[in-house]
């Protein structure tokens, strides 16, 4: 770690644009970031203060050198600040005054796999925050007919490829173009675009072979400078940052990795942060930035100006929430605390008839809730933090069993909560991939519906329709024994039957399926039944259609129950039969 120094306010009008990288798992986000940074991230770092801040600056000199063979004249930005926490959920957690922290984004797509579930989630998030982005079409080295060329420039690389390779590349690019068009987005290869305000740039790259990265830097810098000048104008105000990771260092206490996106922060400043108990103030004990010499080297500084990735050591052991703001207080305490409170509000539509959601940060909470809502899954309550015993107890009391589930995104289940879950019927789904959690939640709901449907069938008469099979008449009375086809619903021993005119048609005494006695039978099936209290060819006849008699007292409940359409249609047929005699049948509470 180097000795203390001070970074002065930038003389330039523009600050560094903040760039976030998103994409589907295994499409090459981390490898691309490693190439851009010019260094690989260490798998494990020694104790003490972790020697890495989750944001990296690529200064203008490095960009100019990488793009010197391209038309890089007139660059005014001081560099690019890349967020080293890739992914659409991390993007959601990075806020700046209600909008996205990132000024621009890179969406990484495996050119051979195309658009995948997490790609779609990333597109949705980018559209939601109205964040401009480019596409890095990665893994062009895996396309057939690839020829290795010693150059980092895509424009040089493509000129030295066989026509077969060029054709294969274009086919894959236009597959992405066509898919993006389905999401309302126009796109094309970057060197074929005349108006970048209307068309998303696709830059073919190979992170593995280090091809196309200069073009990515060139396009990012050009777009930011040309179209985002007002957003990246430096403002000399009290420091505003977004916390992207909270570290509890044994040797140093609480360390906050953050992105300073406006203003200045200094050692000794009073800063406001949000905790699980609300906004509080604390003192800046020390500040660190990356040295730029290596990914594991930090420099301690007295002052930092935007935009920069910083590590802030604070003087108090606070339960700070990741994704929340950090604001320097300069005699404006009330205003800052209000700003912290407003920025920390969860923007999720809630519904009493919904489920519980927990996540590690506000943005994650909104991201998972957004995807659940898209699938018609309503949210009753959403909160930051691990799953607790209190959460389980609250969910257990919900009236609707379909809502007795807790979704946990990037959180743990506390030991006391695990014990409570085991003794309850509360479902818990946890994970760190949104689309997988959504899929698992949908499966859980469908399975719970089936369980509830079966319980209801066992507890009360189920609307059912049967037909007597004239070729299977075994006994005419005491009891009638006939073969029947269960056409809809479920019949049970003890069910009363009615005819299509509403007249009583006996009571099911027993059911046999392949010589085995059963208590109930679901449709569709052909079984033998014994029917008490009727005589064949008097009250019932071969080829008759009969219905299970439904008590009027359960009609309203059955109409609200989650049952198959065929069963609900049969219930309506029974109601129609009953109302021939009583027009108001089934309307009582």
Curated annotation (Swiss-Prot):
State the residue spans of region: G2: 48-52
User: Which parts of this chain are annotated as the region G5?
Assistant: 206-208
- InterPro entries per UniProt: EFTU-type (IPR029459), P-loop_NTPase (IPR027417), Small_GTP-bd (IPR005225), T_Tr_GTP-bd_dom (IPR000795), TF_aIF-2_arc (IPR004544), TIF_IF2 (IPR015760), TIF_IF2_dom3 (IPR023115), TIF_IF2_dom3_sf (IPR036925)
The record, for Pfam families, names:
GTP_EFTU, GTP_EFTU_D4, IF-2
UniProt domain tr-type G: residue ranges? 14-231
The GO molecular function terms of this record are: GTP binding; GTPase activity; translation initiation factor activity
| Entry binding sites for GTP | 23-30, 84-88, 138-141
User: Keyword set for this entry?
Assistant: GTP-binding, Initiation factor, Nucleotide-binding, Protein biosynthesis
**Region named G4:** 138-141
> What are the boundaries of the region G1?
23-30
Q: Which GO terms describe its cellular component?
A: cytoplasm
Q: What does this protein do?
A: Function in general translation initiation by promoting the binding of the formylmethionine-tRNA to ribosomes. Seems to function along with eIF-2.
Under the heading HAMAP family, the entry gives: IF_2_A
The protein depicted here goes by the name Probable translation initiation factor IF-2
Q: Look up and give the organism this protein is from.
A: Thermoplasma volcanium (strain ATCC 51530 / DSM 4299 / JCM 9571 / NBRC 15438 / GSS1)
By which gene is this protein encoded?
infB
């Amino acid at each position: 770690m180097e000795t203390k120094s001070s970074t002065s306010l930038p003389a330039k009008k523009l600050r560094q644009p903040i760039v976030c990288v998103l994409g589907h798992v295994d499409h090459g986000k981390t490898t691309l970031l490693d190439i851009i940074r010019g260094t690989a991230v260490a798998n494990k770092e020694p104790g003490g203060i972790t020697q890495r801040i989750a944001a990296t600056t690529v200064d203008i000199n490095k960009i100019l050198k990488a793009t010197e063979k391209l038309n890089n004249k007139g660059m005014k930005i001081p560099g690019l600040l890349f967020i080293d926490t890739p992914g659409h959920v991390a993007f959601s957690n990075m806020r700046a005054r209600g909008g996205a922290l990132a000024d621009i984004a890179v969406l990484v797509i495996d050119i051979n796999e195309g658009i995948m579930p997490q790609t779609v989630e990333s597109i949705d998030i980018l559209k939601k925050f109205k964040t401009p982005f480019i596409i890095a079409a990665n893994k062009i080295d895996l396309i057939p007919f690839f020829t290795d060329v010693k150059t980092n420039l895509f424009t040089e690389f493509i000129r030295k490829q066989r026509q077969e390779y060029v054709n294969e590349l274009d086919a894959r690019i236009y597959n992405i173009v066509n898919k993006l068009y389905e999401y309302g987005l126009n796109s094309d290869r970057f060197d074929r675009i005349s108006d970048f305000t209307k068309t998303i740039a696709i830059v073919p790259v190979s992170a593995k072979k280090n091809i196309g990265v200069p073009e990515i830097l060139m396009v990012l810098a050009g777009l930011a400078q040309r179209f985002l000048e007002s957003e990246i104008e430096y403002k000399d105000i009290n420091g505003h940052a977004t916390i992207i990771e909270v570290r509890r260092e044994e040797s140093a206490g609480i360390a906050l990795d953050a992105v300073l996106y406006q203003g200045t922060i200094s050692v000794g400043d009073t800063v406001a942060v949000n905790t699980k108990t609300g906004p509080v103030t604390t003192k800046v004990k020390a500040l660190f930035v990356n040295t730029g010499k290596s990914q594991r080297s930090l420099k301690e500084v007295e002052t930092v100006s935007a935009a920069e990735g910083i590590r802030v050591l604070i003087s108090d052991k606070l339960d700070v929430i990741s994704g929340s703001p950090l604001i320097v207080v300069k005699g404006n305490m009330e205003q800052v605390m209000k700003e912290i409170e407003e920025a920390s509000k969860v923007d999720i539509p809630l519904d009493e008839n919904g489920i519980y959601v927990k996540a590690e940060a506000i943005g994650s909470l909104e991201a998972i809730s957004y995807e659940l809502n898209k699938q018609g899954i309503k949210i009753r309550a959403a909160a930051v933090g691990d799953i607790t015993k209190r959460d389980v107890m609250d969910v257990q009391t919900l009236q609707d069993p379909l809502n007795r589930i807790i979704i946990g995104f990037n959180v743990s289940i506390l030991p006391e909560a695990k014990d409570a879950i085991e003794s309850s019927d509360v479902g818990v789904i946890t994970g760190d991939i949104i689309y997988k959690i959504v899929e698992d939640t949908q499966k859980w709901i469908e399975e719970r519906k089936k369980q509830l449907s079966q319980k209801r069938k066992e507890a009360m008469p189920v609307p059912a329709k049967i037909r007597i099979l004239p070729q299977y008449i075994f006994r005419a009375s005491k009891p009638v024994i006939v073969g029947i086809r269960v056409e809809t619903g479920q019949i049970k021993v003890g069910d009363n039957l009615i005819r299509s005119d509403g007249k009583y048609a006996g009571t099911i005494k027993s059911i046999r399926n392949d010589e085995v006695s059963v208590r109930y039978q679901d449709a569709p099936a052909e079984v033998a039944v014994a029917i008490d209290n009727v005589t064949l060819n008097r009250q019932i006849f071969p080829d008759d259609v009969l219905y299970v008699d439904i008590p009027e007292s359960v009609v309203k409940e059955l109409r609200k129950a989650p049952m198959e359409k065929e069963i609900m249609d049969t219930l309506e047929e029974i109601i129609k039969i009953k109302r021939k005699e009583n027009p108001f049948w089934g309307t009582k509470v």
